[in-house]
Amino acid sequence: MSGFRFHLRPTVRRWMAQRPALRRTTPNREKDMPNIETGLKDMMSIEGALGAAVVDYGSGMALGTLSATSSLDLNVAAAGNTEVVRAKMRTMDQLGINETLEDILITLSNQYHVIRPLTDRKGQGLFLYLALDRSRSNLALARHRLKGIEEALEV
């Protein structure tokens, strides 16, 4: 993973100190996830991954980002996709839809962008964001892997 850039904001470090550590609940693996970076590395191990972020959609701030390219500003993507998540949640509420939002897919000519809100009660207000190279990724497999990563995170 030497080609990746990882960024964790100082304000996030303070925020994380106030919250329990992320934990992996999958059997036969380390129980403790050292921090958000491990989850991001798992996301970036998905074939075709261009960038990953864990985002607080209350503030629009990326808690952590990991990127394989300098052309994708993940902080801008986090803020913009926060509006997408808020709009979808608001619309579901207005329509009286009482279902769980699993993910939101944005398809571009060369990329897929997958947004997956954390469904655990303790993780509410956060979402995973993954940008994929459309020519190198398998969307179904990427969504499946992202679901597994989301389920393994205990915030």
Report the location of each language-model feature.
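Non-catalytic interaction/Regulatory regions outside core domains
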Residues: 2-155
